[in-house]
């Protein structure tokens, strides 16, 4: 039997535009794409001092999720894990994902790790191994693969199968994020 109580979702990382977006979708019952069943209730802002896309946005997104959606702000990933049923790790700086996950793995909370899961295959492997060790359901992907326009195009292709496409997306190289890994996921989602 399902509970009428929403799943308490904790969020780690308020330096990504996904933080207020996901919070809105889960907490705002009047939103056109509201997702019932869960609610973001607690979050740790995080942030990376050497990554402009992180430190320049963390304060504004923190204020937004706290003031607009009433989400409790805490001082550590561990406090998030203690106070929730499931976790969204949306830190924009993927360099911190492994360390953040190490800090909360023992809590055994199901987790979504926003793209990219890691910046190296060794970090990704370590995250997967930790999840397996602690029996944690974990997933990581870019949500654009589920964008309405893309899924509709795949369903309505006149020839039955798509044989080619041009993809583009944001491509600002970041000194702390190697190569195209951070942003190439968006264009690659269509494949």
For every predicted segment, state its role.
Residues 118-177:
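A contiguous active-site-proximal alpha/beta segment in oxidoreductase catalytic domains
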Residues 108-110, 115-116:
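Short helix/strand-capping hinge loops at secondary-structure junctions
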Residues 16-20, 98, 147, 184-191:
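A structural signal for well-ordered alpha-helical segments within the folded catalytic domains
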Residues 170-191:
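Rossmann-like dinucleotide-binding domain that binds NAD(P)(H)
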Residues 75, 113, 138-140:
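Hydrophobic residues in well-ordered beta-strands that form the structural core
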Residues 16, 117-118:
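Short, glycine/acidic-enriched loop or turn micro-motifs at the edges of active sites
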Residues 2-107, 133-134:
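N-terminal glycine-/serine-/threonine-rich beta1-alpha1-beta2 phosphate-ribose binding loop
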Residues 23, 62-63, 101-102, 124, ...:
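Short amphipathic alpha-helical segments and helix-helix/interface helices
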């Amino acid at each position: 039997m399902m509970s009428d109580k929403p799943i308490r979702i904790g969020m780690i990382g308020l330096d990504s535009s996904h933080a207020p977006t996901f919070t809105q979708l889960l907490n705002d019952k009047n939103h056109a794409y509201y997702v019932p069943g869960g609610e973001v209730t607690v979050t740790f802002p995080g942030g990376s001092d050497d990554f402009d896309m992180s430190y320049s946005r963390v304060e504004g997104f923190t204020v937004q999720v706290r003031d607009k959606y009433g989400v409790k702000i805490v001082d550590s990933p561990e406090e998030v894990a203690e106070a929730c049923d499931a976790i969204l790790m949306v830190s924009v700086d993927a360099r911190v994902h492994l360390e953040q996950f190490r800090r909360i793995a023992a809590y055994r909370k199901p987790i979504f790790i926003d793209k990219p899961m890691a910046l190296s295959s060794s970090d990704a492997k370590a995250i997967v191994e930790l999840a397996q060790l602690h029996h944690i359901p974990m997933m990581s992907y870019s949500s654009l693969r589920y964008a309405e326009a893309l899924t509709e195009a795949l369903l309505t292709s006149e020839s039955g199968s798509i044989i080619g496409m041009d993809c583009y997306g944001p491509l600002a190289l970041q000194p702390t994020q190697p190569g195209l890994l951070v942003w190439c996921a968006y264009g690659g989602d269509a494949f």
